[in-house]
Amino acid sequence: MDEDVQECEGVGGVGSQVSRSESSHHCLTWSDNMRHLFFAVGALSIWGCAQIPPAEVPPPTPSQGQAVVLDIDGTLTPKDINVFEPRLGAADALNSLSRKGYKIVYLTTRVPLFQSGLQDWLRHNGFPPGGLHVAQTAEERDDAARFKAQILAAYARAGWRLAYAYGDSSTDFTAYAEAKIPKERVFALKRRGSKTCQDGIYQACLEGWAEHLTYIEREIPSAK
C-alpha cells in the first residue's frame, strides 16, 4: 500500500482507502463518535430542561399600580400546544396596554422542557416587558388554577390592582374569579380549531387579539 494512503473503517466501509492528510478528519474511532454524540445529547438536555426560576412580586410604584394578567400558552399562542407561534396581533395589544401604564404579568404552567428561551421568545416577538411567573413543581403544573390564583393573591397583597385578565382555559378563569377580577374585565381567547371558548366567567369570547385592539385603544382607560 502506498505510504501516503491508509485503510480506514467507517469511510466507505472497511478497507476503503484515504490519504494520510484526510485520515485525521475521517478516521474517527467509534468511541470518538459516541463521545461527540453523548456530549450533544447532554447539552441539548440541559438546555431544553432549563427551568425558569421563580420571579419576585415587586411593589407598585406611584406611577404604576395597576396590572393586566394573562396566560401564555393558548392565549398568546393559537393553541396551548403551539408554544413557538405567537397569535396575530397579540404583541400589539399588549404593547398598547403597556403604553397606557399597565404592568403586564405573564403566568404559565409550561413544563420545564419548553421553558428555556421563553423570555427570548417574548422579546423576539415584540411582547412588552413584564413579570414572568412559571410553575416550579409538578404539583403546581397539575393545579394551574391554584398556582395562578396564588400568584395573583401575592400581587394583591403587595398592593397591586388587578385591572384586566386574559386566558384561554377554564383554569385561567377560575383563578381570575378567585382573585375577584370583575367579569367585565376578563376576556377569553378561542383556541385555533375550537368552536367556542372554554367555560368560565368572562365578558367576551374573542376570536383573536387583532379584533380586540380597537377596544383596548378606545375603551380601556389609561392607568397613568
Where are the language model's segments positioned?
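Glycine- and small hydrophobic-enriched segments that form the cores of compact globular domains
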Residues: 67, 78-81, 87-91, 106
